[in-house]
Curated annotation (Swiss-Prot):
SMART domains: KOW
Keyword rRNA-binding in annotation: yes
Gene of this entry: rplX
Transmembrane segments: none
Entries under Gene3D superfamilies matching the protein: 2.30.30.30
Keyword list, A-Z: Ribonucleoprotein, Ribosomal protein, RNA-binding, rRNA-binding
Protein name, UniProt field: Large ribosomal subunit protein uL24
Length: 101
């Protein structure tokens, strides 16, 4: 998967289109990512020791990886490619040519 935890990404589709934020979690088995402050859902929690009455908690839900683009250091969003630099495989922004790793 081309997105890693800690990458700065721009959401390119969905209700949060245009938002730029950091990836909190990458879920490669299901091709999804959790992005900070994006796709907030309300979860109804059952009563437990912490909340004896239960609660409605807002949390970030995963979005599909195809709905985000990785930003480079200059803030340019583009597709991610792979190339070898000094014998190491690195990710780079195909639009700007900037190395991401």
């Amino acid at each position: 998967m081309f997105v890693k935890k800690g990458d700065k990404v721009r959401v390119i589709a969905g209700k949060d289109k245009g938002v730029e934020a950091l990836v909190v979690t990458a879920l490669p088995k299901v091709n999804k990512v959790v992005v900070e402050g994006v796709n907030i859902v309300k979860k109804h929690q059952k009563p437990n020791n912490e909340n004896p009455q239960g609660a409605i908690v807002e949390k970030e839900a995963p979005i599909h990886v195809s709905n985000v683009q990785v930003l480079d250091k200059n803030g340019v969003a583009g597709r991610v490619g792979y190339k070898f630099v000094d014998g190491k495989k690195v990710r780079y922004n195909k639009k700007s040519g900037e190395v991401l790793d």
